């Protein structure tokens, strides 16, 4: 008699099943409702297809739409496959590559047949219609294990150049899986190479819960030397209600787009002559300077000493630090040139002598620390820099202020003893909390743990990770109120890190602040201090930032506040606008008094209707408009219009100045 499999369920019960049984069989045995609702299964912690047989006794948790995170991941993966199937059905000869799920949808990279132009936006409606047809057909999604040779033969026979190339590089001993859409080998079946898992059939998707959004160029394997493909992006959800909510969020995000508002408010611009670098206009640079002054006050108060380090350093320094091997492709590298003695005036490169624009500030800060002899009594030493860095990001990855090539960090490094690490991290947690609260952000705290590729011993990593856990616990943040979570494999190559994820006004999250404890870089760059025993010891180096980069943080602020920045940050805090020319003299007097009080103010004395002026300054997001006419001039008053409010307040000029001074006071300088 065949021994039955013991399948343990989350409620503690155990189901006995015949050999060859699947999670779908367990769901059906429990009840028809669950059998219908089940989308996939978690078998011994691994997400699998519902119809994949158990391999022995197992722990089983069935995934339904209530398990939203896992359900969305599965659905989006399936939408990507349906997209590729639809494109090949509509345009035979299309070559497919790969298409993953993303944070809010999916994409697939494809190459159009030579007989037509690359796919464009005009093709999306037809693709969507074909996708709905495939979904409504409720085609089974069937997993099979193939050999490497089978895969290569299949893709070469069908002219799938990209898939064949990929298959040839797969390890011979790896279990290789394909998925059929439709009965395997059937007339209307479609095949793709994929690890899975997938839903049981295309009909498990909602045909009204996805939308194709855009197309973009992409290179095979992300290499510009390879053929160009078309990346088709879509968004996918579990139901139409979720899709509509997402599209509404996108509409709201478009209104808040920092690139659009940056133009309207005349803050900055970008252009092709300086890919990934920002041209700050006077209005935008006022925001920058306010943030910089704010951060300097916070860092001065927390015991940091500001330094300034070189933009360019010898490649040997980056080799020694380990960055050359890890970041070389993302560094701007230039030859260290000397005069050519044979042809005076021309420049040639010395062999193997290269310089690089710094992609980060850390090695330079170690070099500052190493100047002179440091005693344990001097520690901790906190070195801060508004450090300008450069990273050679691909053109396609650049995005306004959010992803740039030249950026400035509120960077700092703390050199301390082993015994000081937890207290320094705890103090940083407190400082970060103060800053984010000053800007009105809620946030989550995450711990990014060791990646597969890393420097340092396991003992060092164990210690560094535990120190961060202890510090967060002491700061009172290791709980659900702060969204505490550990992220395996997400740490830097030299250290684990704490991450701060801000939530903006429309619910999006932005990872900004970090702190990481590093024992690798001090070792590689031979940083030491003299201990109490008179011997040399390695300091622990804590890398930390709060804004992350000024460019990105300003972009986040613009979108979070939809351009309506807090008064203390607004480039122009008030405009005095006249109704009639008779009030010009009084308006100039008001502007002078406001400037004397430290308010950033302009006067608008143009011969234009007041409604025109109101609209113009509202578009520029000026927080307060002080309207003056003949009566106000005679009475020494102003009519104050606050951005976003319908009613205006009439008050004396002195009261208006007092109100604006209070509103314009940075949060860290307020009493109480």
From Swiss-Prot:
<dbReference type="GO" id="GO:0046872">
    <property type="term" value="F:metal ion binding"/>
</dbReference>
<keyword id="KW-0436">Ligase</keyword>
<keyword id="KW-0067">ATP-binding</keyword>
<dbReference type="GO" id="GO:0000049">
    <property type="term" value="F:tRNA binding"/>
</dbReference>
<dbReference type="InterPro" id="IPR004095">
    <property type="entry name" value="TGS"/>
</dbReference>
<dbReference type="InterPro" id="IPR012676">
    <property type="entry name" value="TGS-like"/>
</dbReference>
<keyword id="KW-0862">Zinc</keyword>
<dbReference type="InterPro" id="IPR047246">
    <property type="entry name" value="ThrRS_anticodon"/>
</dbReference>
<comment type="similarity">
    <text>Belongs to the class-II aminoacyl-tRNA synthetase family.</text>
</comment>
<dbReference type="Pfam" id="PF03129">
    <property type="entry name" value="HGTP_anticodon"/>
</dbReference>
<keyword id="KW-0479">Metal-binding</keyword>
<feature type="binding site">
    <location>
        <position position="413"/>
    </location>
    <ligand>
        <name>Zn(2+)</name>
    </ligand>
</feature>
<dbReference type="GO" id="GO:0005829">
    <property type="term" value="C:cytosol"/>
</dbReference>
<dbReference type="InterPro" id="IPR018163">
    <property type="entry name" value="Thr/Ala-tRNA-synth_IIc_edit"/>
</dbReference>
<feature type="domain" description="TGS">
    <location>
        <begin position="1"/>
        <end position="64"/>
    </location>
</feature>
<keyword id="KW-0648">Protein biosynthesis</keyword>
<keyword id="KW-0547">Nucleotide-binding</keyword>
<keyword id="KW-0820">tRNA-binding</keyword>
<dbReference type="InterPro" id="IPR002314">
    <property type="entry name" value="aa-tRNA-synt_IIb"/>
</dbReference>
<dbReference type="Pfam" id="PF02824">
    <property type="entry name" value="TGS"/>
</dbReference>
<dbReference type="InterPro" id="IPR002320">
    <property type="entry name" value="Thr-tRNA-ligase_IIa"/>
</dbReference>
<dbReference type="InterPro" id="IPR045864">
    <property type="entry name" value="aa-tRNA-synth_II/BPL/LPL"/>
</dbReference>
<comment type="function">
    <text>Catalyzes the attachment of threonine to tRNA(Thr) in a two-step reaction: L-threonine is first activated by ATP to form Thr-AMP and then transferred to the acceptor end of tRNA(Thr). Also edits incorrectly charged L-seryl-tRNA(Thr).</text>
</comment>
<dbReference type="InterPro" id="IPR004154">
    <property type="entry name" value="Anticodon-bd"/>
</dbReference>
<protein>
    <recommendedName>
        <fullName>Threonine--tRNA ligase</fullName>
        <ecNumber>6.1.1.3</ecNumber>
    </recommendedName>
</protein>
<comment type="subunit">
    <text>Homodimer.</text>
</comment>
<dbReference type="InterPro" id="IPR036621">
    <property type="entry name" value="Anticodon-bd_dom_sf"/>
</dbReference>
<dbReference type="InterPro" id="IPR006195">
    <property type="entry name" value="aa-tRNA-synth_II"/>
</dbReference>
<feature type="region of interest" description="Catalytic">
    <location>
        <begin position="257"/>
        <end position="566"/>
    </location>
</feature>
<dbReference type="GO" id="GO:0004829">
    <property type="term" value="F:threonine-tRNA ligase activity"/>
</dbReference>
<keyword id="KW-0030">Aminoacyl-tRNA synthetase</keyword>
<feature type="binding site">
    <location>
        <position position="362"/>
    </location>
    <ligand>
        <name>Zn(2+)</name>
    </ligand>
</feature>
<dbReference type="GO" id="GO:0006435">
    <property type="term" value="P:threonyl-tRNA aminoacylation"/>
</dbReference>
<dbReference type="Pfam" id="PF07973">
    <property type="entry name" value="tRNA_SAD"/>
</dbReference>
<dbReference type="InterPro" id="IPR012675">
    <property type="entry name" value="Beta-grasp_dom_sf"/>
</dbReference>
<dbReference type="GO" id="GO:0005524">
    <property type="term" value="F:ATP binding"/>
</dbReference>
<dbReference type="Pfam" id="PF00587">
    <property type="entry name" value="tRNA-synt_2b"/>
</dbReference>
<dbReference type="InterPro" id="IPR033728">
    <property type="entry name" value="ThrRS_core"/>
</dbReference>
<keyword id="KW-0963">Cytoplasm</keyword>
<feature type="binding site">
    <location>
        <position position="543"/>
    </location>
    <ligand>
        <name>Zn(2+)</name>
    </ligand>
</feature>
<keyword id="KW-0694">RNA-binding</keyword>
<dbReference type="InterPro" id="IPR012947">
    <property type="entry name" value="tRNA_SAD"/>
</dbReference>
